[in-house]
Design a protein with these regions (language model features):
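Flexible "cap/lid" loop of the alpha/beta hydrolase fold
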Residues: 1-15
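A short, basic/aromatic alpha-helical/loop segment that forms part
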Residues: 10, 94-95, 125
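An amphipathic alpha-helix signature
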Residues: 13-21, 36
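Acidic/histidine metal-binding catalytic segments
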Residues: 26-41
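Conserved serine/cysteine hydrolase catalytic core
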Residues: 43-106, 115
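Conserved beta-strand segments of alpha/beta enzyme cores
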Residues: 110-112
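Catalytic histidine-centered segment of alpha/beta-hydrolase-like enzymes
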Residues: 116-131
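C-terminal alpha-helix
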Residues: 133-141
Length: 142
């Protein structure tokens, strides 16, 4: 992901809102107004142009993960036994496969699960499927 942790060359939120549908592959049927909200959430408009609103060091962590050998994560997941667990998956996610989500559900039949249609990784958390999963998760907390 060439854009992670970098300030865009775009100057305004309007430009970013127009560009986001082309950068955020896997997100379908997103209204222009939502792309504008996302642009305003992720970038601050300055006289020099847009600046990211998150730590740019995220880029190094993100890139190093691609170069590293994948660790076996199932023991970590299994260690959550007895704890409330929820998964909100974008149906078009290129990072969390349907097979992995199915295995998570097999291992934890009690896991709260939502799959958000027309969304990639990471889905918006204020859509009905996401909100229902978040509410269900919060209800299970002690």
């Amino acid at each position: 992901c060439a854009y992670v942790g970098r300030n865009p060359r775009l100057k305004t939120h309007e430009e970013a809102a127009a560009a986001l549908p082309h950068v955020m592959e896997g997100f379908a049927n997103v209204p222009e107004s939502r792309w504008r909200e996302e642009a305003e959430k992720h970038y601050v408009q300055t006289p020099e142009g847009l600046k990211i609103t998150y730590d740019p060091a995220l880029r190094e962590a993100f890139l190093s993960a691609f170069g590293a050998e994948l660790a076996e994560m199932w023991p970590c997941f299994d260690a959550l036994a007895g704890k409330p667990v929820a998964l909100i998956r974008g149906a078009n996610s290129e990072l969390l496969s349907p097979a992995t989500a199915a295995e998570m559900r097999r291992r934890r039949p009690d896991m709260i699960f939502a799959e958000v249609p027309d969304r990639a990784h990471i889905p918006f958390l204020d859509e009905p499927e996401s909100l229902a999963a978040i509410r269900a998760f919060l209800e299970r907390l002690p």
